[in-house]
Regions:
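Solvent-exposed, charged helical/coil patches
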Residues: 399-402
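Helix-hairpin-helix/helix-loop-helix acidic hairpins
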Residues: 375-379
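Short, solvent-exposed loop/turn elements at beta->coil junctions and helix N-caps
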Residues: 427-431
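RNA/tRNA-interacting regions in translation and RNA-turnover enzymes
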Residues: 1-348, 352-359, 364-371, 385, ...
Length: 432
């Protein structure tokens, strides 16, 4: 964040202060960057997010990011009582704020203000997908409070997504780490909001049938929230085409597919390369076991050259095996072995996320770990016990129970434990 030049490195205010804002890459900055970049960036949102996640501050600095600040979360003795005062305080301390603000006291005025923002949307030098309506008075905000996820004193209004038409050329099937196949639509290039769209997502084969899609037909394309292109339906223009075949075997390994609910799955976990490699890379990720030097490319080499088929195999790798990989010399091999050793002592929530339980993100893994305290409790939990956890619903509870009931998954976990991986238990608060 220190590489974002508009963020002040020192401020006049003395005391504890937490400010909240949003990082952006201006469209003009993106255009200038792409003129000289070896690998042009696809869009400003991804460019900003990727820059902040990058471990090299020099890469972040080259993106020339900006930021807008809009909220103070924590402050000692705030010298203001409403939003106007808060924004003025931010400005006085050198934090850039948005100039696109307006007051309203009636519903009609709110609609007018939103329409005015939308009218300026195309002329802005940064991407927006809506406008936020907020209560100004801070005491009123405090009285209204918050839900588990959102403040009750603010609501985001999303603009209608931009749409265009394209011809559906082909449908291929992408394989994820869980073995689920997801259809990917290939389209004639079409411009939506300044972005050339050539591919779009479909949910499953049932989605293809519901939308009556055919190869060669004209379809509506929408970029939801200006980010993810999706096919919303077929254009009723009399266009015809050929049926889209439902796959019966895995496109990667040729194994028979099975249906689970609305989705198709390849159950060949061990020798289906794409899902095995994706599973290894996920296991090693920063939010999972945080095994540095183990990228998806390295996972692919480990699969091809070292016989690594699931995460437990990682802990049996030798230095000699690593030195046989492309790009690995003594230091990198030693670093990976050290990272593997370090990962043996891991947080329970990180472990639960790393093993790839479907529908379990890091936040849910943290909730589940905190509730049960130990891996054994999670592995033997019933659906009813899981439903006692706030924010855990039927789908998540069923996913956990099914994961540990599958012999392949349970065996993988047991092999990890046998290899010395030890998820730390969490002390649960006493009943009294």
């Amino acid at each position: 964040v220190r590489t974002i030049r508009c963020v002040p490195l020192s401020i006049p205010y003395q005391g504890l202060l937490e400010v909240q804002g949003e990082c952006i890459m201006r469209l003009s900055t993106l255009e200038a960057y792409n003129k000289t970049a070896d690998e042009p960036l696809k869009n400003a949102r991804n460019a900003a997010a990727g820059a902040l996640r990058n471990l090299d501050p020099a890469v972040t600095a080259r993106r020339k990011l900006d930021a807008f600040f809009y909220q103070i979360g924590t402050i000692e003795n705030p010298p203001y009582h409403d939003l106007d005062g808060m924004i003025a305080f931010l400005q006085e301390n050198g934090f850039p704020t948005s100039r696109y603000e307006a007051h309203a006291t009636t519903y009609d005025e709110i609609v007018q203000r939103i329409d005015a923002v939308e009218a300026q949307r195309e002329s802005l030098d940064f991407l927006i997908d809506g406008a936020v309506v907020k209560v100004c008075d801070l005491q009123t905000r405090q009285a209204m409070g918050n839900t588990e996820k959102f403040p009750r004193w603010a609501v985001a209004y999303k603009f209608a997504a931009e749409e265009n038409t394209a011809t559906l050329l082909d449908v291929t099937w992408e394989l994820g780490r869980t073995g689920k196949l997801t259809p990917l639509a290939h389209l004639t290039p079409t411009d939506i909001g300044g972005v050339t769209v050539k591919r779009a997502t479909l949910n499953n084969f049932g989605d293809i049938q519901r939308k009556r899609l055919l190869l060669g037909c004209t379809v509506w394309i929408r970029r939801s929230n200006d980010v993810i292109p999706e096919i919303t339906g077929r254009v009723e223009d009399g266009s015809t085409g050929s049926e889209i075949a439902k796959p019966t075997v895995c496109p990667a390994c040729g194994a028979p597919l099975v249906e689970r609910g609305a989705n198709l799955y390849c159950v060949n976990r061990q020798t289906c390369r794409p899902q095995a490699v994706a599973r290894l890379a996920h296991f090693a990720g920063r939010d999972a076991m945080d095994i540095t030097s183990l990228s998806e490319k390295t996972a692919g080499q480990l699969y091809d050259l070292c016989g690594v088929r699931d995460p437990a195999d990682l802990y049996h790798l030798t230095r000699e095996q690593l030195l046989s990989l492309e790009g690995f010399q003594d230091k990198r091999a030693d670093n990976l072995l050290a990272a593997l050793q370090k990962s043996r002592d891991c947080a329970l929530d990180a472990f639960l996320f790393a093993i790839g339980i479907p529908n379990i993100g890091r936040g849910t893994a943290r909730d589940v770990a905190g509730h049960f305290g130990a891996l054994a409790g999670v592995m033997n939990a019933t659906q009813e016990e899981l439903l006692e956890i706030p924010d855990v619903g039927d789908i998540v509870a069923q996913s956990v129970v099914e994961f540990f009931s599958f012999p392949e998954d349970r065996t993988m976990v047991e092999r990890l434990l046998a290899a010395g991986v030890t998820p730390r238990e969490i002390a649960k608060p006493s009943a009294d």
